[in-house]
From Swiss-Prot:
PTM field: May be glycosylated.
Organism of this sequence: Ophiophagus hannah (King cobra)
Protein's recorded name: Snaclec ophioluxin subunit beta
Family that this chain belongs to: Belongs to the snaclec family.
Compartmental location: Secreted
Lineage summary: Eukaryota, Metazoa, Chordata, Craniata, Vertebrata
Expression (tissue specificity): Expressed by the venom gland.
Keyword list, A-Z: Disulfide bond, Glycoprotein, Hemostasis impairing toxin, Platelet aggregation activating toxin, Secreted, Toxin
Length: 13
């Protein structure tokens, strides 16, 4: 989870 709504990566967001 980095930042913001990362729609290209469900697990990261």
């Amino acid at each position: 989870g980095l930042c913001c709504p990362m729609r290209w990566s469900s697990s990261e967001g």
